[in-house]
Amino acid sequence: TQIVVEKGGGRKEFEFTPGPLFTNVLLADEINRATPKTQSAMLEAMEERQVTVAGKTHGLREPFFVMATQNPIEMEGTYTLPEAQMDRFFFRLHIAFPKFEELKKILRQTTINESYTIQPVFDSGSAVAKVAEMRKLVREVLVSSDMEDYITSIILATHPDNKDALDSTSGGDNITDLVGRYVTYGAGPRGAQAVTLAAKANALLDGR
């Protein structure tokens, strides 16, 4: 953001001050409580890895990673996330209510005086380099032409007006009919990129 700074002789000028976006990992807690104007400001950051203030572009740190939480129940004081913003997230996970044993574990860990130490995966000095190396390694995983065809078919199958969807059924219903009934807008090219990169990362973790 820009703040007013008083210079010599009583002269005042706007001076750029980096905000919370200038970090490696950004956690947007309850992002749906942010106003549409605030949410739209994140579009450039998430896609271009930069922000533009007063006509000047400022690059963000690499790697730049955004995580967000959303309250799916409470509606008061919340705003609908723009489709363009949701499309920029890699995954959207729905967290179910804890099961019996999970809830007991939460009780044990949060209602006693014992403290827990988080063990870092790697030291802060080498973190950026290691993450960059891992991201590069994921992209080097080979994907066959058949797999690319399959991923492309999955993405196209999410479009109601698609004519090239996979000819399959689910519980007796044709996939095309299900999509036409429940989906308004299908996944875009970013969806295909996300599925491909997720498959590559999963294959790498599996030693393939």
Regions found by a protein language model. Give the residues of each.
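Conserved ASCE/P-loop NTPase catalytic core
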Residues: T1-L93, K99-F100
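Conserved AAA+ ATPase "SRH/arginine-finger" region at the nucleotide-binding site
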Residues: F90-E102, P120-F122, V141-V143
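An amphipathic alpha-helix signature
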Residues: F100, K104-R108, E148, T152
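Conserved phosphate-handling catalytic cores of large alpha/beta enzymes
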Residues: T111
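Basic, amphipathic alpha-helical bundle interface domains used for macromolecular binding and assembly
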Residues: E114-R208
